[in-house]
């Protein structure tokens, strides 16, 4: 590999110039007629150092004319020549015209054993008169990332109208394009999306969604993994919050979604309230998007679901401070009766005095809003989502019918649940963290300065998530609305056409690699699909202009006539597993319980869903089944009756009867202890009680569960 050749050498180095935070060099290039047919602004150059095996790498940022032909006398001559309609002779241009080029220094390139090595070093000084050259085809491919091994193709190297796509049939030719040789396709290690922050900026219609679908189609050809303690390889899941319903199924223009990528058939899981357009696409659906908020911490739900100005109100403080049992009862009460819920019962659950009627009414109204917005007692969505993420699936959550606050609240609760889980598991001896990439559209709504109620979980995820293997892909049309401290933490940047000066300045302020010459191209070249890519990860920390490959050009709708049968998908397997667990639990529950809505969750065809009069309370079914199994465990109950058992022992015994498909079995078992004891032995302090006893380890006392009388059930 050679850095310099006779054909590519074009000028000389003149010296370094003042550039503020940037290193700039002044170059002199003689007049050459072919310059007007080649891309100049943004083109890469090399300046020779000690020998031709190493050079300074730079990018042209500006060009100005010099020489006698650019002087006052030369201008007069040129004007006369134009007015007399005669061309300026080429020999005059060659003798009396040259170009002054300002080059931004990007680093150092060196040929080592035939390979090109880049170092982001700016300490070397070329001598005045050192030769300057454009990159040879081989070096250009290396500098632009064409030769990166085991990486995904993201697009073509492109400088405005000039696209380096010679001979590639995937490029859809347009009249304005100038196809250049060689073929240069920058590549990106999509595994670098994991546990890192990726930013995608563009106005609507310039390729944001196309890029994201392309990245994840490439990332999940083979399920990505991260290495954990002991060399254990753990799969990485992705959760995509889709506000427009464009990521999973084909849209009304038949543009494909992720379900149309054959390699992703067993990797895409969709949560949506919509019915699929065909049996094939419906088979990717795992369930609805609503949650069972009884299984979430009241402080999390209230702090995310209610606006910041309400957080200091007395009724809100009371709601956030509720224990799990009271929260469970309150949600059930509000779900059943709404604002008509019995005020006395609400006061009791909130521990309010008789005179605090206003607080009770306000709390009831707030809870009614939250429950109507989010709650579904038959939901297993959170468990199914976490199970799918553990297995390394792409989970698309369709929030297109939950515009505004409800969508932010739902996504915020999901991110908080995943973040808290990983935080709790992080330091355990056998951690079970779930590496997850969160894809967030309209990121300015949750990372801006508007004080949105859903902002907290997003900020925590972006700022602190990396150490817990939590990555984020933040997509926005308004980077200027996102906090600079968040933007500056971005690891991978994809910037397309932007219109606002404020947005362009915000990009430069957060990442000075996007200097004025790049911003001017983003502003003045509104070409859909054209953008600039920069990453701090791959060892090439300089911007690369690209034209992104078309996702639509690589994939087509797999069921264009909507007449294909259901497919064997990850979602179908997930549904089967959870429905089997629920059916097994229902068989243990006495027959006088609520009628089942189980079949409604098992159907795959949108047209044969059965009519269900009453919804199934899934949590109650699992709890009742666990209590029934616990009630039949005679050996354990005999030991409990005779000697008593530590609370933890009862909890662990109950945990055995809770299906392992549920994500929070420990918490469920803990909350179930008093309910199970009351169901079998009667009310607390009548049939059973708890007492503190010294622990064997000598630490804080242990809570024991004791039976006061024989079984009363």
Language-model regions, residue ranges each:
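Substrate-engagement module of ASCE P-loop NTPases
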Residues: 219-223, 418-423, 457-473
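P-loop NTPase motor domains
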Residues: 228-233, 245-255, 275-460, 535
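N-terminal pre-Walker A segment at the start of P-loop NTPase domains
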Residues: 146-186
